[in-house]
Amino acid sequence: MLVKVYGSAVFGVEATTITIEVNIVKGIGYHLVGLPDIAIKESNFRIAAALQNTGYKIPGKKITINMAPADMRKEGSAYDLSLAIGILAANEQIQSDEIEKYIIMGELSLDGGLQPIKGALPIAIQARKEGFKGFILPAQNAKEAAIVDNLEVYGVENIKEVINFFNGERELVRTIVDTRKEFYKNLEFPEFDFADVKGQETVKRCMEIAAAGGHNIILIGPPGSGKTMLAKRLPSILPPMTLHEALETTKIHSVVGRIKDTGLMSHRPFRSPHHTISDVALVGGGTYPQPGEISLAHNGVLFLDELPEFKRAVLEVMRQPLEDREVTISRAKFSITYPSSFMLVASMNPSPSGYFNDPEAPVNSTPAEMQRYMSKISGPLLDRIDIHIEVNPVPFEKLSDDRKGESSSEIRKRVIAARNIQTERFKEYEHIHYNAQMNTKQIQKFCKVSEESLKLLKNAMMKLNLSARAYDRILKVARTIADLEGTDNVQPHHIGEAIQYRSLDREGWFGNS
């Protein structure tokens, strides 16, 4: 008897429906075709044990299973449940015409229990798109899949529940999530707050400018000056995620199985990989490509602590995704594109010893050591970082002050107002949403400056020996400062403030010339 069951495969952040055809005839043998990987080929052992331990059995006949489309490689153990249901239906241990109306996915334990799967959200989205009635999956993934409207989602604990459901012996409890309610309930409660930061008013101002214009930023300071603390609080002042952004972000985290029992992600992600990370782990890849850290930081913040400690080759592969806001991973027979629109926040010590030009420091590095230290960060990468700011240690008087600083919610209000101005400014441009994304043509159009401002900029570049690449960055940051003030034109004092935020472009900094 021939039976069809439907599962799904995830490629990139999109799902493709897989038709599982199970045919049972007289004879012996178990044949599984359609480019399954090792985990799927091993499923017959898990299925046999699970069925035996729940009172069922694999028939002693010839079983042929085809996973179509046959030219698409399938991977993982998430097909266990669909294969098992297909075998039972083909052997008439399940009597139902409803099986073909559902996507069925789940990894089987030997006792018949179900383990969670990866990619439940994109699978649910594709199931709704193709008109399936429902999605049966492990209970741990039910809330995540139930984000999708107009699709019946049933979370189950074991295979026996599914068998009894299709045999009409029991009803399954549908998982229902009020997506908007869940999303907005968690939206206003960031984990960290700028009110906790003592002192560092100049750096806080820089973080506000970076958030308002989407500018990448690097923090330079000795150990213990608060660089990591400041970076962790940046997501709390970024504009709240829209429902569309939240869905997009949740899909990526779903693919790697990082969604717990939370459903829709409502906070912007903050990713902080260790400096020993490989290039594949950072940008994504592998034999079966998976999203990397830059994609997991999509719509959020990627924090690279101790930037010069990262391998130069690892940093270099990040250059193109920073520019394109996406990363494409190519293999011989296919390519996958992951979104990677994130804000880069980097931090570094001012020298290998951690101190620079500090007479009280116990160790100072030689010029040669500092040159080697800085050479790990290439010019093209620094070219993509708009704001460089030095972070100094906080004096004892400010550390011991009990007064709270300005809260993240207050700063966020100003950031949102500035972003609204930019949304209106760039409404005719499809791929530009904030100031950091402007190219030379848009800078000329939207960052017009007076003769006085030009004179100030020229003098600063000559006296401070700023590099040529700093020119456009200064104008973009100045435009954001003007937006925060709500002024139409870039004024001289906006230029003056933006010039301060180009520390690494100054001649003499680590031997720059």
What are these regions (language model features)?
Residues N299, D305-L307, V317:
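Walker B catalytic acidic pair
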